[in-house]
């Protein structure tokens, strides 16, 4: 069973439909239900500050899931809130599961960065099993993560090169939306579901 964390951050149905192609899914904000799942997805569309406020009752549950080495996938805002803090809402702490912060794109013609863009794979990662390097995925965001180099799996160019995929132990995250990225995005979800 795959658990999708429901914290009023939108986009739940599209990720649910994508995951249901490969496994049973529960969308929930109930700690016991989440702790019983084999894998967890933290989706997200919206604002860093309100996301952290809505997630507050589930923080300890998320830490336990990660500590128990349950495969965990953050998507878009769900990637960003894994970090320590964001320029989007100064003074609000992120989950701090991944060291680093979230910064706004600078010196770009247009925000948000929206549409299809390629991901250059810089390190082996099971999420990209069977996926060609420089494949295209769908992005919608104005901020990007700024992590330690050792957890970066994929990079994307938009005004500058930024980390678009990370992996640290059992935690995986994508800045793009695999559920909106056609067959190649579904392959990412399938690879996540099949993780041991």
Swiss-Prot record:
<dbReference type="InterPro" id="IPR017926">
    <property type="entry name" value="GATASE"/>
</dbReference>
<keyword id="KW-0028">Amino-acid biosynthesis</keyword>
<feature type="active site" description="Nucleophile">
    <location>
        <position position="76"/>
    </location>
</feature>
<dbReference type="GO" id="GO:0000105">
    <property type="term" value="P:L-histidine biosynthetic process"/>
</dbReference>
<comment type="function">
    <text>IGPS catalyzes the conversion of PRFAR and glutamine to IGP, AICAR and glutamate. The HisH subunit catalyzes the hydrolysis of glutamine to glutamate and ammonia as part of the synthesis of IGP and AICAR. The resulting ammonia molecule is channeled to the active site of HisF.</text>
</comment>
<keyword id="KW-0378">Hydrolase</keyword>
<keyword id="KW-0368">Histidine biosynthesis</keyword>
<dbReference type="InterPro" id="IPR010139">
    <property type="entry name" value="Imidazole-glycPsynth_HisH"/>
</dbReference>
<feature type="active site">
    <location>
        <position position="179"/>
    </location>
</feature>
<dbReference type="GO" id="GO:0005737">
    <property type="term" value="C:cytoplasm"/>
</dbReference>
<feature type="active site">
    <location>
        <position position="177"/>
    </location>
</feature>
<keyword id="KW-0315">Glutamine amidotransferase</keyword>
<comment type="pathway">
    <text>Amino-acid biosynthesis; L-histidine biosynthesis; L-histidine from 5-phospho-alpha-D-ribose 1-diphosphate: step 5/9.</text>
</comment>
<comment type="subunit">
    <text>Heterodimer of HisH and HisF.</text>
</comment>
<keyword id="KW-0963">Cytoplasm</keyword>
<dbReference type="Pfam" id="PF00117">
    <property type="entry name" value="GATase"/>
</dbReference>
<dbReference type="GO" id="GO:0016829">
    <property type="term" value="F:lyase activity"/>
</dbReference>
<feature type="domain" description="Glutamine amidotransferase type-1">
    <location>
        <begin position="1"/>
        <end position="196"/>
    </location>
</feature>
<dbReference type="GO" id="GO:0000107">
    <property type="term" value="F:imidazoleglycerol-phosphate synthase activity"/>
</dbReference>
<keyword id="KW-0456">Lyase</keyword>
<protein>
    <recommendedName>
        <fullName>Imidazole glycerol phosphate synthase subunit HisH</fullName>
        <ecNumber>4.3.2.10</ecNumber>
        <ecNumber>3.5.1.2</ecNumber>
    </recommendedName>
</protein>
<dbReference type="GO" id="GO:0004359">
    <property type="term" value="F:glutaminase activity"/>
</dbReference>
<dbReference type="InterPro" id="IPR029062">
    <property type="entry name" value="Class_I_gatase-like"/>
</dbReference>
